[in-house]
Design a protein with these regions (language model features):
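Short alpha-helical transmembrane segments in multi-pass integral membrane proteins
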Residues: 1-23, 82-147, 183, 191-206
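Residue-level signal for short hydrophobic patches within transmembrane helices
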Residues: 16-35, 63-70, 146
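Interfacial/gating helices of multi-pass transporter permease domains
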Residues: 21, 44-65, 131-136, 196-201
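Generic alpha-helical transmembrane segments of integral inner-membrane proteins
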Residues: 27, 31, 35, 39, ...
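Helix-terminus/linker motif at the lipid-water interface of multi-pass membrane proteins
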Residues: 31, 35-54, 124-131, 187-196
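Small-residue-rich hydrophobic transmembrane alpha-helices
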Residues: 53-114, 151-170
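Short runs within selected transmembrane alpha-helices of multi-pass transporters and secretion channels
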Residues: 75, 143-162, 170-178, 199-205
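Membrane-water interface regions at transmembrane-helix termini and the short interhelical loops
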Residues: 157-165, 185-194
Protein backbone atom coordinates (compact mmCIF):
# COMPACT_ATOMS: atom_id res chain seq x y z
CA UNK A 1 0.00 0.00 0.00
CA UNK A 2 1.55 3.31 -1.07
CA UNK A 3 1.37 6.61 0.78
CA UNK A 4 -1.64 7.92 -1.13
CA UNK A 5 -3.64 4.83 -0.29
CA UNK A 6 -2.95 5.37 3.41
CA UNK A 7 -4.55 8.81 3.41
CA UNK A 8 -7.89 9.04 5.24
CA UNK A 9 -8.14 5.32 6.02
CA UNK A 10 -10.42 5.78 9.03
CA UNK A 11 -10.78 2.04 9.57
CA UNK A 12 -7.09 1.66 10.40
CA UNK A 13 -5.71 1.86 13.94
CA UNK A 14 -8.03 2.26 16.95
CA UNK A 15 -11.48 2.49 15.37
CA UNK A 16 -13.20 4.65 17.98
CA UNK A 17 -10.41 7.22 17.88
CA UNK A 18 -10.52 7.37 14.08
CA UNK A 19 -14.30 7.79 14.16
CA UNK A 20 -14.05 10.62 16.68
CA UNK A 21 -11.39 12.34 14.57
CA UNK A 22 -13.75 12.07 11.63
CA UNK A 23 -16.84 13.06 13.63
CA UNK A 24 -15.69 16.21 15.43
CA UNK A 25 -14.92 18.27 12.28
CA UNK A 26 -18.48 17.57 11.11
CA UNK A 27 -19.90 18.76 14.45
CA UNK A 28 -17.76 21.90 14.41
CA UNK A 29 -18.75 22.45 10.78
CA UNK A 30 -22.42 22.48 11.78
CA UNK A 31 -21.58 25.02 14.50
CA UNK A 32 -19.82 27.35 12.07
CA UNK A 33 -22.65 26.97 9.56
CA UNK A 34 -25.05 28.24 12.22
CA UNK A 35 -22.72 31.17 12.96
CA UNK A 36 -22.62 31.92 9.22
CA UNK A 37 -26.43 32.05 9.00
CA UNK A 38 -26.87 33.89 12.31
CA UNK A 39 -24.41 36.61 11.29
CA UNK A 40 -26.51 37.43 8.22
CA UNK A 41 -29.66 37.62 10.34
CA UNK A 42 -28.09 39.85 13.00
CA UNK A 43 -26.55 42.27 10.50
CA UNK A 44 -29.74 42.58 8.42
CA UNK A 45 -31.99 42.94 11.46
CA UNK A 46 -29.71 45.45 13.16
CA UNK A 47 -28.63 47.63 10.25
CA UNK A 48 -31.31 47.27 7.55
CA UNK A 49 -34.65 46.74 9.27
CA UNK A 50 -37.57 44.42 9.96
CA UNK A 51 -38.79 44.33 6.37
CA UNK A 52 -35.41 43.23 5.05
CA UNK A 53 -35.11 40.66 7.84
CA UNK A 54 -38.50 39.26 6.90
CA UNK A 55 -37.41 39.07 3.26
CA UNK A 56 -34.22 37.18 4.10
CA UNK A 57 -35.64 34.93 6.80
CA UNK A 58 -39.20 34.32 5.62
CA UNK A 59 -40.53 32.58 2.52
CA UNK A 60 -37.29 33.15 0.61
CA UNK A 61 -35.32 31.33 3.28
CA UNK A 62 -37.77 28.42 3.25
CA UNK A 63 -37.43 28.02 -0.51
CA UNK A 64 -33.64 28.21 -0.29
CA UNK A 65 -33.50 25.67 2.55
CA UNK A 66 -35.78 23.29 0.67
CA UNK A 67 -33.49 23.30 -2.36
CA UNK A 68 -30.30 22.99 -0.32
CA UNK A 69 -31.77 20.16 1.77
CA UNK A 70 -32.79 18.27 -1.35
CA UNK A 71 -29.33 18.49 -2.88
CA UNK A 72 -27.56 17.71 0.39
CA UNK A 73 -29.57 14.48 0.32
CA UNK A 74 -28.51 13.78 -3.26
CA UNK A 75 -24.90 14.56 -2.37
CA UNK A 76 -25.08 12.09 0.50
CA UNK A 77 -26.43 9.44 -1.86
CA UNK A 78 -23.60 10.06 -4.31
CA UNK A 79 -21.13 9.93 -1.43
CA UNK A 80 -22.33 6.44 -0.49
CA UNK A 81 -21.60 5.14 -3.99
CA UNK A 82 -18.25 6.93 -4.14
CA UNK A 83 -17.20 5.64 -0.72
CA UNK A 84 -17.92 2.07 -1.83
CA UNK A 85 -15.73 2.41 -4.92
CA UNK A 86 -13.04 4.17 -2.86
CA UNK A 87 -13.05 1.45 -0.22
CA UNK A 88 -12.89 -1.26 -2.88
CA UNK A 89 -10.03 0.63 -4.60
CA UNK A 90 -12.02 0.48 -7.83
CA UNK A 91 -10.35 3.48 -9.48
CA UNK A 92 -12.16 3.11 -12.80
CA UNK A 93 -15.68 3.25 -11.35
CA UNK A 94 -14.56 5.79 -8.75
CA UNK A 95 -13.47 8.14 -11.53
CA UNK A 96 -16.79 7.64 -13.36
CA UNK A 97 -18.77 8.28 -10.19
CA UNK A 98 -16.83 11.47 -9.42
CA UNK A 99 -17.29 12.85 -12.93
CA UNK A 100 -20.99 11.94 -12.91
CA UNK A 101 -21.55 13.58 -9.52
CA UNK A 102 -19.94 16.87 -10.51
CA UNK A 103 -21.51 16.89 -13.97
CA UNK A 104 -24.92 16.35 -12.39
CA UNK A 105 -24.30 19.17 -9.90
CA UNK A 106 -23.39 21.60 -12.67
CA UNK A 107 -26.29 20.57 -14.91
CA UNK A 108 -28.80 20.68 -12.06
CA UNK A 109 -27.44 24.05 -10.96
CA UNK A 110 -27.95 25.52 -14.43
CA UNK A 111 -31.51 24.15 -14.67
CA UNK A 112 -32.38 25.40 -11.19
CA UNK A 113 -30.95 28.83 -11.96
CA UNK A 114 -33.18 29.26 -15.01
CA UNK A 115 -36.32 27.68 -13.53
CA UNK A 116 -35.84 29.32 -10.15
CA UNK A 117 -35.51 32.84 -11.55
CA UNK A 118 -38.71 32.45 -13.58
CA UNK A 119 -40.73 30.84 -10.79
CA UNK A 120 -39.53 32.97 -7.87
CA UNK A 121 -42.41 35.42 -7.80
CA UNK A 122 -45.19 32.82 -8.38
CA UNK A 123 -43.69 30.67 -5.60
CA UNK A 124 -43.60 33.61 -3.18
CA UNK A 125 -47.21 34.50 -3.97
CA UNK A 126 -48.25 30.86 -3.60
CA UNK A 127 -46.71 30.87 -0.12
CA UNK A 128 -48.74 34.00 0.70
CA UNK A 129 -45.68 36.13 1.31
CA UNK A 130 -46.72 39.58 2.64
CA UNK A 131 -46.92 42.12 -0.16
CA UNK A 132 -44.46 44.51 1.49
CA UNK A 133 -41.63 41.95 1.45
CA UNK A 134 -42.29 40.21 -1.88
CA UNK A 135 -39.98 42.53 -3.81
CA UNK A 136 -37.01 42.13 -1.46
CA UNK A 137 -37.63 38.38 -1.24
CA UNK A 138 -37.65 38.14 -5.03
CA UNK A 139 -34.37 40.06 -5.29
CA UNK A 140 -32.82 37.78 -2.67
CA UNK A 141 -33.93 34.60 -4.48
CA UNK A 142 -32.93 35.84 -7.94
CA UNK A 143 -29.36 36.41 -6.75
CA UNK A 144 -29.45 33.18 -4.75
CA UNK A 145 -30.44 31.17 -7.82
CA UNK A 146 -27.72 32.95 -9.79
CA UNK A 147 -25.13 31.29 -7.55
CA UNK A 148 -26.81 27.88 -7.50
CA UNK A 149 -24.11 26.10 -9.52
CA UNK A 150 -21.40 27.08 -7.02
CA UNK A 151 -23.61 26.05 -4.11
CA UNK A 152 -24.34 22.58 -5.50
CA UNK A 153 -20.75 21.92 -6.55
CA UNK A 154 -19.54 22.87 -3.05
CA UNK A 155 -22.08 20.59 -1.35
CA UNK A 156 -21.15 17.72 -3.65
CA UNK A 157 -17.43 18.30 -3.13
CA UNK A 158 -17.79 18.43 0.66
CA UNK A 159 -19.84 15.21 0.66
CA UNK A 160 -17.24 13.46 -1.51
CA UNK A 161 -14.36 14.52 0.75
CA UNK A 162 -16.22 13.14 3.76
CA UNK A 163 -16.99 9.96 1.82
CA UNK A 164 -13.28 9.23 1.47
CA UNK A 165 -12.61 9.99 5.14
CA UNK A 166 -11.58 13.66 4.92
CA UNK A 167 -13.88 15.72 7.12
CA UNK A 168 -11.24 18.34 7.97
CA UNK A 169 -10.87 20.22 4.69
CA UNK A 170 -14.60 21.06 4.41
CA UNK A 171 -14.35 22.41 7.98
CA UNK A 172 -11.32 24.57 7.16
CA UNK A 173 -13.12 26.04 4.15
CA UNK A 174 -16.23 26.69 6.24
CA UNK A 175 -14.26 28.45 9.00
CA UNK A 176 -12.51 30.72 6.50
CA UNK A 177 -15.79 31.45 4.73
CA UNK A 178 -17.55 32.15 8.03
CA UNK A 179 -14.96 34.73 9.07
CA UNK A 180 -15.03 36.37 5.64
CA UNK A 181 -18.83 36.38 5.74
CA UNK A 182 -18.94 38.35 8.99
CA UNK A 183 -16.38 40.89 7.77
CA UNK A 184 -17.99 41.33 4.36
CA UNK A 185 -21.50 41.41 5.85
CA UNK A 186 -20.50 44.57 7.70
CA UNK A 187 -18.77 45.97 4.61
CA UNK A 188 -21.57 45.29 2.10
CA UNK A 189 -24.56 45.98 4.33
CA UNK A 190 -23.28 48.66 6.71
CA UNK A 191 -20.53 50.49 4.81
CA UNK A 192 -21.95 50.18 1.29
CA UNK A 193 -25.63 50.23 2.35
CA UNK A 194 -26.58 47.43 -0.06
CA UNK A 195 -29.21 45.86 2.22
CA UNK A 196 -30.75 42.54 1.14
CA UNK A 197 -28.88 42.68 -2.17
CA UNK A 198 -25.57 42.91 -0.33
CA UNK A 199 -26.34 39.88 1.86
CA UNK A 200 -27.29 37.71 -1.09
CA UNK A 201 -24.39 38.87 -3.25
CA UNK A 202 -22.15 37.99 -0.35
CA UNK A 203 -23.73 34.54 -0.08
CA UNK A 204 -23.17 33.93 -3.79
CA UNK A 205 -19.55 35.12 -3.73
CA UNK A 206 -18.84 32.96 -0.66
CA UNK A 207 -20.31 29.94 -2.42
CA UNK A 208 -18.07 30.64 -5.40
CA UNK A 209 -15.04 30.89 -3.10
CA UNK A 210 -15.98 27.56 -1.50
Amino acid sequence: MNEKEKVNQITEGVIWKQLLLFFFPIVFGTFFQQIYNTADTIVVGRFVGKQALAAVGGSASQIANLIVGFFVGLSSGAAVVISQFYGAKDKKNLSKALHTAFAFSIAAGIVLTVVGIFLTRPALLLMKTPADVVEDSAVYLHIYFGGMVFNLVYNMGAAILRAVGDSKRPLYVLIITCVLNIILDLLFVVAFGMGVTGVCLLYTSDAADD
